[in-house]
A protein has these predicted regions:
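C-terminal lobe/tail of nucleotide-utilizing enzymes
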Residues: 58-120
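Charged helix-capping and loop-helix junction motifs
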Residues: 23-30, 54-57, 82-87
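Phosphate-binding/switch loop-helix module in NTP-utilizing enzymes
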Residues: 1-22, 29
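Short histidine/acidic/glycine/proline-rich micro-motifs that form metal-
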Residues: 17-18, 46-47, 74-78
Length: 120
């Protein structure tokens, strides 16, 4: 971790969520707290994501970790009628929200928006 301290940009990817074990002695959230860097919260756009995002934002806020953006990733095509996770989450938070559709879609605009948020 120390060797990245003077880097212009370092991306560390966690997996499984903030409370997922990273090692025997810590979780993803512990690493984020240790490196003291802003975070991009990534969540799969499916049923249950609103709960996951709100709980994760609450935990990040509790530990005073800045959230640069929320990325809704890999939108599931078979969602119930009327379900719009993007709009619902957007109404619940002021954190910038990015929606990345599946691999077949053109996501260039959203990726550029995310890069701009990260680099500012």
């Amino acid at each position: 971790i120390e060797r990245f301290a003077n880097s212009d940009l370092t991306i560390i990817e966690g997996a499984g969520g903030l409370c997922s074990p990273l090692a025997r002695d810590g979780y993803n959230i512990d690493l984020i707290r240790k490196v003291k860097v802003p975070t991009v919260l990534v969540a799969k756009d499916e049923i249950g994501v609103i709960n996951n995002v709100i709980l994760s934002l609450s935990m990040l806020q509790k530990y005073k970790i800045k959230v640069l953006a929320i990325v809704l990733n890999r939108k599931v095509s078979s969602q119930p009628d009327g379900m719009n996770n993007y709009q619902e989450i957007k109404s619940l938070t002021k954190v910038p929200l990015i929606q990345i559709l599946n691999k077949k879609e053109d996501n260039d605009r959203e990726f550029k928006k995310l890069i701009k948020i990260i680099l500012v």
